[in-house]
Amino acid sequence: LMVAMTHVRQMEKADRDRSQALLAEAELKSMIEDYPDSPLLDEAKLKLREVQEVLAEGVYKIAGFYYLKKVFPAAADRYREALTKYPDYSGSSDALFYLAESLRRNNNGPESAIYYARIISDHPLSERVNDAKQRLTAMNAPIPQPNPVALARAQQTPHEDKGIFGKMF
């Protein structure tokens, strides 16, 4: 844990060099795997979650850059990366929305419908739900029901303001 914490302290912001965050992530994963009975396990898991949030935010910001530049295939790839590598990312509903938007704007409507639907089913209290429903309606695609487990989890989790970057789009 001490080696991992050294990397955590040297981490940059999400939009800067990721090397220390990647090293911290590797050290924390190794510690969690190698020492499952450690009294520091809970602290290591919490730190890993924090490090992965920084890494996910970095990937999300890169995707946002591509989206703003209208390079939709690259944006879609980065949004997918954020969602795949960091499934617990706090901005996953926004990443899903902009992944769907990138696909739609790159003339891939059928695939975009999958991600709009995931916003509604997996993030039922997200600010993106109404936009996702509108997009699905415009495509004549079915609108799914919220997943009851996701709904219960969303109701228990306090809603955080994502700051200025989350409001840019």
Label each region the model flagged.
Residues L1-F169:
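Acidic, polar-rich low-complexity tracts and alpha-helical solenoid repeat scaffolds
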